[in-house]
Swiss-Prot record:
It is found in: Cytoplasm. The gene is ureB. This is Urease subunit beta. Pathway: Nitrogen metabolism; urea degradation; CO(2) and NH(3) from urea (urease route): step 1/1. It catalyses: urea + 2 H2O + H(+) = hydrogencarbonate + 2 NH4(+). Belongs to the urease beta subunit family. It is an enzyme of class 3 (hydrolase). It comes from Ruegeria pomeroyi (strain ATCC 700808 / DSM 15171 / DSS-3) (Silicibacter pomeroyi). The lineage of its organism: Bacteria, Pseudomonadati, Pseudomonadota, Alphaproteobacteria, Rhodobacterales. One of its GO terms (biological process) is urea catabolic process. Its EC number is 3.5.1.5.
Length: 101
């Protein structure tokens, strides 16, 4: 093996298959771009993003780990969210939960 060498799997990988999804319209009402990472608790994102935060509680973006979605100023787009997995405890972010969901 060579350091950094990759051994990709054959075929197509399907992410988060079978997970419940929530679709929300999100608008960036601010004057700067906002970027949200794959595992960020979506309900606690930048206040310039306008959407139903109650529906996003306990959810994250349905995108590949380590990637992000960027919202340009004035942009409106639909996002697909999935429930945060594991023990469903959230700490940090904007400190709006700080414990179990």
């Amino acid at each position: 093996m060579i350091p950094g060498e990759l051994f990709p799997a054959e075929g197509e990988l399907i992410l988060n298959q079978g997970r419940a999804v929530t679709r929300l319209m999100v608008a960036n009402t601010g004057d700067r771009p906002v970027q949200v990472g794959s595992h960020y608790h979506f309900a606690e994102t930048n206040p310039a993003l306008e959407f139903d935060r109650g529906a996003a509680r306990g959810m994250r973006l349905d995108i590949a780990a380590g990637t992000a979605v960027r919202f340009e100023p004035g942009q409106r787009r639909e996002v697909v969210l999935i429930p945060i997995g594991g023990a469903r405890r959230i700490y940090g972010f904007n400190q709006q939960v700080m414990g179990e969901l």
